[in-house]
């Protein structure tokens, strides 16, 4: 075969066992429904060991795109660090040994920053517990946790329980919770520095609502209809109303999120550069991150560096002198570029990148179509030229609007995607492209939990694969790592040995 191929990723578009709770099943999506009638389809697994995560762990976009581009199962930081905690080797990692030794010898505070939940997308509470236990092995008594509440990868009001669990864990130690803030502020990734400033001012300047009871403060937020993701800054104080701890020059800071994208902005403000407009100034810190947030950072120590993934789909296409387009809106742009290329920032020879900005709204239920129509309008003319050999396209709506937990908005998101998919596939068929329609993980097919509360998290449901091609009549079930070999077979390019999964044709 010698086909031109489009990989169309409908982000967060899973297959629900219960249509009642599914935005997809409740939406009017006639075109995507017609694809199931007219073309071969099957299912892909995007969770747990199928994508290199711990068993039962829901997939996510970073992991999904990494597996898609790699053509193999890529073992993720979560699985790797879980093993280190379980086997008690975390405390023996040299970077942590050095940091704790420095703190001990210089009588400095150790601050842990990160997302306190077991969602396993950005962080895991077991890692924080392992790190805290390690500080106690070293006899450190000035240890503080700056907790970011989640409510997005886990239930919106689960934060009080996670903080209570953390308090139980540190009860008989000198370790203390120093501050609390929602991830919406501390973990922005859209250069909304006014959000990051709230987190910076909290942990550096002690600016927040003073509290002596962390769990009570979170529950108070719930009473005011503020869920975990959006909890306003809370600073923990002593009996004199003074902050228990703020981050000061020469302190040790350990950011324990293992996923890189939402740790970058706060790290930049704390350790890399001054933001004069926001009145944020970098401090001279002993700064440690669990994984490598950015190659260009100065004076940041990394506990677990990524193994380089070579011979990804992008690299194989470059070697075969094929052209490729990577196209997405801001929210998923790193996924179709950096993650799909196995952690590589630089475009391949013959690779064109098309970015459309995600709308600047507070939450995407306010604009559920996001920038899908702009993406479609940018891609269709490229397909009509018929020149590009491969396209990787991501529609973010099912995931990003699914995260709001608002069914009516997610339905509108699905309908917008359907309209855009129709135009792209019509152009694809007219210009002899084969389109593989898949998702990277589930989300908007389960908008309601069994207890009736909104579900804002990803799912472990299987996702569809539809092969839109005039000739091919069958496609098999598989995992995300099978997609790159499938694409190479369609394009008539030999699969490299490093791609250990297989084609689904």
Predicted regions and their residues:
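Feature captures the catalytic ectodomains and active-site-proximal regions of enzymes
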Residues: 1-505
């Amino acid at each position: 075969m010698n086909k031109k191929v489009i990989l169309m990723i409908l982000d967060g578009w899973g297959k629900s066992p219960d249509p009642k709770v599914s935005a997809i099943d409740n939406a009017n999506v006639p075109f995507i429904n017609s694809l199931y009638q007219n073309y071969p389809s099957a299912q892909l697994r995007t969770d747990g060991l199928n994508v290199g995560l711990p068993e039962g762990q829901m997939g996510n976009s970073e992991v999904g795109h990494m597996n898609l581009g790699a053509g193999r199962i890529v073992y993720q930081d979560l699985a790797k660090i879980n093993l280190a905690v379980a086997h008690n080797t975390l405390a023996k990692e040299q970077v942590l040994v050095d940091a704790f030794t420095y703190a001990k010898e210089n009588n400095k505070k150790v601050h842990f920053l990160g997302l306190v939940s077991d969602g396993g997308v950005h962080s895991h509470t077991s890692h924080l517990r392992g790190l805290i236990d390690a500080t106690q092995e070293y006899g450190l008594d000035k240890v503080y946790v700056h907790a970011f509440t989640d409510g997005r990868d886990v239930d919106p009001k689960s934060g009080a329980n996670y903080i209570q669990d953390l308090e139980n864990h540190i009860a008989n130690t000198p370790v203390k919770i120093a501050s609390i803030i929602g991830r919406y502020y501390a973990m922005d990734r859209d250069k909304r520095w006014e959000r990051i400033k709230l987190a910076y001012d909290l942990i550096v300047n002690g600016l927040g609502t003073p509290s002596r009871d962390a769990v009570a403060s979170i529950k108070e937020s719930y009473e005011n209809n503020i869920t975990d993701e959006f909890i306003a800054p809370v600073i923990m104080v002593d009996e004199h109303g003074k902050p228990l701890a703020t981050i000061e020059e020469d302190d040790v800071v350990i950011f324990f999120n293992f996923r890189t994208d939402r740790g970058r902005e706060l790290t930049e403000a704390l350790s890399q550069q001054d933001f004069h407009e926001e009145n944020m100034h970098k401090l001279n810190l002993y700064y440690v991150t669990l994984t490598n947030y950015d190659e260009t950072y100065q004076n940041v120590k990394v506990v677990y560096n990524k193994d380089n993934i070579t011979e990804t789909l992008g690299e194989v296409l470059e070697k075969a002198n094929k052209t490729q387009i990577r196209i997405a809106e801001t929210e998923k742009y790193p996924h179709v570029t950096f993650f799909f290329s196995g952690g590589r920032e630089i475009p391949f020879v013959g690779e064109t990148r098309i970015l459309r900005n995600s709308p600047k709204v507070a939450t995407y239920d306010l604009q559920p179509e996001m920038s899908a129509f702009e993406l479609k309008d940018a891609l269709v003319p490229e397909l009509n030229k018929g020149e590009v050999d491969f396209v990787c396209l991501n529609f973010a709506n099912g995931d990003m609007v699914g995260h709001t937990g608002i069914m009516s908005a997610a339905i509108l998101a699905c309908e917008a995607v359907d309209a855009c998919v129709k135009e792209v596939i019509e152009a694809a068929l007219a210009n002899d492209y084969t389109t593989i329609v898949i998702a990277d993980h589930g989300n908007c097919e389960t908008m309601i939990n069994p207890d009736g509360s909104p579900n804002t998290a990803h799912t472990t449901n299987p996702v569809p694969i539809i092969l839109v091609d005039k000739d091919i009549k069958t496609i098999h079930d598989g995992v995300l790592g099978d997609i790159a070999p499938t694409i190479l077979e369609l394009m008539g390019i030999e699969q490299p040995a490093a791609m250990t999964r297989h084609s689904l044709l």
